[in-house]
Regions:
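Domain-level signal for soluble alpha/beta catalytic cores
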Residues: 1-397
Length: 397
């Protein structure tokens, strides 16, 4: 995994604006034309690569445009046995955060009524998901059967990177962590939380290992380490939540046991929705759990106004030797604003002063695709690179 040896490197969290071939790609895939879909996937990846390179992104990804939505039942039912769809009752949310305490706060009653009617994000031109009426539910022993599917997907992406002249072994490929899966995969089979989390971890282990076996860096996306805290209703104490989160971290490490640490980066944020976030758990309460995850690099939301001061945590917490911190220095929460390079540079300099310049890579708070208009998202990555260059001049001279 690359480090900022001579300058601050840049990266992002995975999801980027869809390529111009997106409509044709989806049509080909829906019609079962696998040959045409593969061609268009390659075209799309190469377009995304070009966009990243033009803006100065160092550690790139494929943009994730070809991946199914988080709650796409075909993804789960096609790759794992033991999962099915169960019709949700009238009062049953179809994901864990459906009735978080903040959504019931009278201070924000009109805000959430507006969100219910109009949605969370401005119109970004992104694909929209239909409202779910069923719960994805574990009803029996989980078993992975998607080996051939994931290998085929990874080979298509690898080939597209190769045709674009990119060394895919220095690119990252995101996958959902066990804890994040728990947001929308319910369980009617396992008797305890421990059994549930370890079953999810073991069932998804094949996906994680396939990514690394194909030569990519695995990025494990786990907003749940932070964002699940404000979803419990009634709320948990910090101590009780830490016990719940620690169990999920243990299960995550179980799933990663066969993967070298230097091929893993771990992403945490407080959820990508544009809510007030008044009930977010402070980073100081989970930073030790974060550092317990088997990974070389830790990507953390850090630029939005609710969490911009989180850099202060690193005054009292030592980043372990050999680890890399990827603070978000541009974000999705300011979806219509582009950060100035000077603001980006200042944020990076603060982190570098606390954990060491060679241990910092400039990142984004979360995926920008679908959360910002494409024009704004690409401009944010341009600002990211320009800000990293400014910080590098000041840190290296």
């Amino acid at each position: 995994m690359r480090r900022s040896a001579e300058r601050i490197l840049t990266t992002h969290c995975g999801r980027l604006p869809d390529p111009s071939t997106m409509g044709a790609f989806e049509q080909a895939r829906a019609s079962g034309d696998e040959v045409r879909a593969a061609e268009l996937l390659g075209d799309g990846v190469r377009e995304i690569v070009r966009e990243q390179r033009e803006r100065g992104v160092d550690v790139i990804g494929d943009g994730e445009f070809h991946k199914p939505a988080f709650r796409d039942p075909d993804y789960y039912l096609g790759r794992w046995s033991g999962i099915t769809q169960v019709e949700a009752g009238a009062d049953e949310p179809t994901w864990f955060g459906g009735r978080s305490p903040e959504t019931l706060d009278p201070r924000f009653e009109r805000f959430f009524e507006f969100v219910e009617e109009h949605g969370i994000f401005p119109d970004t031109g992104a694909r929209r998901s239909l409202a779910a009426s069923h719960r994805l539910t574990v009803v029996g022993p989980l078993a992975y059967r998607g080996q051939d599917v994931i290998r085929g997907e990874l080979e298509l992406v690898r080939r597209a990177f190769e045709m674009a002249g990119v060394d895919h072994t220095e690119t990252f490929y995101p996958q959902l962590a066990p804890g994040w899966l728990g947001h929308f995969v319910f369980d009617e089979h396992h008797a305890s939380a421990e059994e549930r989390w370890y079953a999810l971890a073991e069932a998804w282990r094949g996906e994680y290992e396939a990514v690394v076996e194909a030569g990519f860096i695995l990025q494990l996306d786990d907003p749940a380490l932070a964002d699940k805290y404000y979803m419990f209703n009634p709320p948990l104490s910090v101590a009780d939540y830490r016990r719940d989160a620690a169990l999920r971290v243990e299960a995550t490490n179980h799933a990663l046991r066969n993967i070298p640490e230097d091929r893993i980066r771990y992403h945490v944020c407080w959820g990508s929705w544009h809510f007030p976030h008044t009930t977010d758990i402070p980073l100081e309460h989970i930073v030790d759990l974060l550092l317990n995850v088997k990974a070389q690099a830790y990507s953390i939301e850090a630029s939005n106004v609710r969490h911009e001061a989180d850099y202060l945590v690193w005054k009292d917490v030592t980043l372990p030797e050999g680890k890399i911190l990827i603070p978000g220095v541009v974000g999705h929460a300011t979806s219509n604003l582009v950060e100035s390079p000077e603001v980006v540079a200042g944020r990076l300099q603060r982190y570098a002063s606390l954990v060491g310049r060679e241990n910092v890579i400039a990142g984004t708070d979360c995926g920008l695709g679908g959360r910002c208009h494409p024009d704004v998202a690409w401009a944010k990555l341009q600002a990211l690179a320009e800000g990293a260059a400014l910080a590098s001049e000041r840190l290296w001279g």
